[in-house]
Amino acid sequence: MALTLASAADLLKEHHLLREIIQGDVWTDDPARIASADEPFAGITYDTRKVTPGTLLCCKGQFKAEYLNGIDEAGLAAYVAETEYSAATATPGLIVNDARKAMSLLSAAFYGYPQNELTVIGVTGTKGKTTTSYFTQALINAVSGGKVALFSSVDNCLDGHTYVESDLTTPESMDAFRMMREAADNGMKYLVMEVSSQAYKVDRVYGLTFDVAAFLNISPDHISPIEHPTFEDYLYCKRQIIVNAKSLVLGADSLHADLLREDAEAAGIGVTTFALHDADNAGTSADVVAWPADPAHASFHIADGDQALGDYHLSIDGDFNYLNAAAAIAIAHAVGVSLDDADALHAIESVRIAGRMEQFRDPQSNTLAIVDYAHNYASVTALLDFVYERWGEENPRITLVTGSAGNKAYDRRKEIVEAAENRIANFIFTAEDTDTEPIIDICMEMQGYITNKDVVSTVISDRLTAITNAIYDARAHADRFNILLIIGKGNERWIKDHRKHVPFDGDDHVVERMFGL
């Protein structure tokens, strides 16, 4: 059924969001008093630049009346806002208590509730969301004939095989429902999507129920005035995925796992667990368990409780990815994939993710460069654990090329240094989505957290120059095995500076070019 002003008003009333409808001198809660109430909207947007005849505009965030200049001439049909804009437009306004919640509900309705045509899987956690999502897509693709869409912080895939770079970990609600509609129209039957804490903080997934929610892990992150004021708030927002799910897949060793189980019990949903054991298969009991077989070749065992399911080899290095694989297998099982389906389980073996644990060897020196998206204490620690387990006996000289995001997650700056300073030889601090903060200020702040007098540190604001210098420095120490850890950006082809995406080659391309690969 097409969305009209009348049906929009009814939907908003149902969720106790509508305050009144205003058009000129008419203030009412009865849409029948608005002449155009039964005319279907031709489009929906939150960007005034995209208004065309018949469009419903959702005014969210820091919206300003000046954005409405000339909007009636563009064909605006109605608007949704927390403030009336009668002085700027003659069109009717749906005045609401919460514009973001309203936008999510109205977007779902406008696009015909596409989530009802998909099995929707939400993946959350502090680390591992992207890799787990890609593994999950591959597993379910193997049994569904490639019918799995993907929303991730790296790419979006709406047809099972074409990947387009994404802007947000979890898209704005309107974009999410639009893409769900496209995916459903493309014949997709499943959707795997990363769900960030901010998605619940700012209602990007309001009204969306997940068929399966996966809660991988939790550790302090995203603590800042513009994200989460405390860890409690961060965890609380993450936990909302459980309240809005039909079943839960849970990391058995996650911090606060007992609380998460309590949430699931209160919601009346079942729980499937996964865990990573040590090489002797000792660890927390779980429904799906992974443990190392041959770490040098990224091989691991998988078991369904006590029943062995076979050995598998990943194309992505890192013991922590065995845990991500176990999570994906548990998720796939939760949506009906048989754990006896060896072909499906083997589908994870060919998965590669640009900018995640990518390794490059320099033909001119004994240097290994690893490009990864590690950007907080947990992920940097996991990366260094992997490096030491794999190459520790070779006594490598390790250089970390890093920065930290501007205007948010301020604790990361100190935590990255704390995770690395006693395990590496050299820091190079550089740009990483510094936004409106001066690059040099962030780098100098991070440098100031170093307490190990033996570690060398350099500040090089330009990221291209920083990576280039790291490679030249490694070649100058050719008598040692050098490992360059270039983290924070992965394969992203831009750096955020003053709210704009400035084109950048990408860490992987810079390394490939310097190494002549």
Language model: regions and residue ranges:
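ATP-dependent carboxylate-amine ligase
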Residues: M1-I22, V51-L56, Q62-K64, H333-D340, ...
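N-terminal leader/targeting and accessory segments in enzymes
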Residues: M1-L105, H313, D317, H509-L517
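Phosphate-binding loop of NTP-binding sites
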Residues: E14, L105-L248, A252, H256-G270
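Short loop/helix-cap segments at secondary-structure boundaries that form the rim of catalytic
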Residues: V51-T52, G70-E73, T83-G93, C157-H161, ...
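A short, gly/pro- and small-residue-rich
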Residues: E66-A81, G93-A102, F210-I218, E232-Y236, ...
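Short, conserved loop/helix-junction motifs that constitute active-site signature segments
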Residues: I71-G75, Y206-T209, I241-K246, A264-A267, ...
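Acidic, Mg2+-coordinating active-site environments of NTP-dependent enzymes
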Residues: A87-T89, A214-A369, Q447-T451
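Buried hydrophobic packing segments
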Residues: M103-S107, T136, I140, A183, ...
